[in-house]
UniProtKB/Swiss-Prot annotation:
ATP binds at residues 151-207. GO terms for molecular function: ATP binding; glutathione synthase activity; metal ion binding. Pathway: Sulfur metabolism; glutathione biosynthesis; glutathione from L-cysteine and L-glutamate: step 2/2. The keyword Magnesium applies. Residues 125-309 form the ATP-grasp domain. NCBIfam families: glut_syn (TIGR01380), PRK05246.1 (NF003573). Pfam families: GSH-S_ATP, GSH-S_N. Keywords: ATP-binding, Glutathione biosynthesis, Ligase, Magnesium, Manganese, Metal-binding, Nucleotide-binding. The gene is gshb. The keyword Cell inner membrane does not apply. This is Glutathione synthetase. Mg(2+) binds at E280, N282.
Length: 312
């Protein structure tokens, strides 16, 4: 059965189709005969309890520089849609949170993927703390003294904003680095929220693995290796993608968290693993499926739509 699918995303003109997961999901939906609609989060509205968006009919093509066509914008009641993909990138701020409140009003009659209430209640750097034995030593605080004590305990640490994304604002403070005090001052000025400190994992030099799970089951993995001059492995900031397979420890991690992901209705999730430790659970807009398909032929977009269609 053909579905009406609205994609809530950053504007389609801004995506890099070579590595964009939302684009891959849209291509697969179109291939299956589903009707695609596009809208940016700032086109979402609610009036008198009716949730709507100014949507444009969308066609996509796997052609750089000519990857989309949009129709004329039309205000549509989103209950007319069968599926909405919640796919705009973080930051996970009040704008983002407000969209989850609005979309929650129409879910699950209109299937919102991922479930907007659970997306709101599962920020990736906090959700992961539900599994403390699977992650490195971690501190969430805005108290500078707590961070300095943590640094004295572990020497090398990572300091990053609690609601950042794409590697922005991530700092490696090696033992003896004298920048911690000034960094804490800067973080206090830039961020109203607490920030996060973690024990530095030296295994990151060998890569930070992104594992994709569909309905709580691992379906593919990608290793991201940082450059020689950067502590971050995110592909947005120059991390090099490499083909990878799951280790026994990574399968153990997936088996532990899988039931919780299914219980919360998370269809598409990406987790980050360094060595033996999980560092994040990404439920907002996980990436990596295009790279995985290029490396080993696994069509994760097809597995995603199989899971979505089974719910319709």
């Amino acid at each position: 059965m053909a579905l009406k699918v609205a994609v809530q995303m950053d504007h389609i003109s801004t995506v890099n189709i070579t590595g964009d997961t939302t684009f891959a999901l849209s291509l697969e939906a179109q291939k299956r005969g589903h009707e695609l609609f596009h809208y940016a989060p700032d086109r979402l509205s609610m009036r008198d309890g009716v949730v709507s968006a100014r949507v444009e009919k969308m066609e996509v093509r796997d052609v750089k520089g000519d990857h989309y066509t949009l129709g004329e914008p039309v205000r549509r009641d989103l209950t007319e849609m069968d599926v909405i993909l919640l796919r705009q990138d973080p930051p996970f701020d009040m704008n983002y949170i407000t969209t989850t409140h609005l979309l929650e009003r129409i879910h699950p009659k209109t299937l919102v993927v991922n479930d907007p209430a659970w997306v709101r209640n599962s920020p990736e750097k906090i959700f992961v703390t539900e599994f403390p034995d699977l992650m490195p030593e971690t501190l969430i605080t805005k108290d500078p003294q707590e961070v300095m004590d943590f640094r004295r305990e572990f020497g090398d640490i990572i300091l990053k904003p609690l609601y950042g994304n794409g590697g922005a604002g991530v700092f490696h403070l090696a033992d003896g680095d004298r920048n911690l005090t000034s960094l804490l001052e800067m973080f206090g000025q830039l961020f109203r929220e607490p920030f996060i400190a973690q024990r530095y994992l030296k295994d990151v030099r060998a890569g930070d693995k992104r594992i994709i799970l569909i309905d709580g089951e691992p379906v593919g993995a990608l290793n991201r290796v940082p450059s020689e001059t950067d502590a971050r492995s995110n592909m947005h900031v120059g991390g090099r993608p490499e083909q990878s397979k799951l280790t026994p420890r990574e399968r153990e991690i997936c088996a532990r968290i899988g039931p919780s992901l299914k219980e919360r209705g998370f269809i598409l999730v990406g987790i980050d693993v360094i060595g033996d430790y999980m560092t994040e659970i990404n439920v907002t807009s996980p990436t990596g499926i295009r790279e995985i398909e290029r490396f080993d032929g696994t069509n994760i977009a097809a597995l995603f739509w199989d899971a979505v269609e089974a719910r319709r």
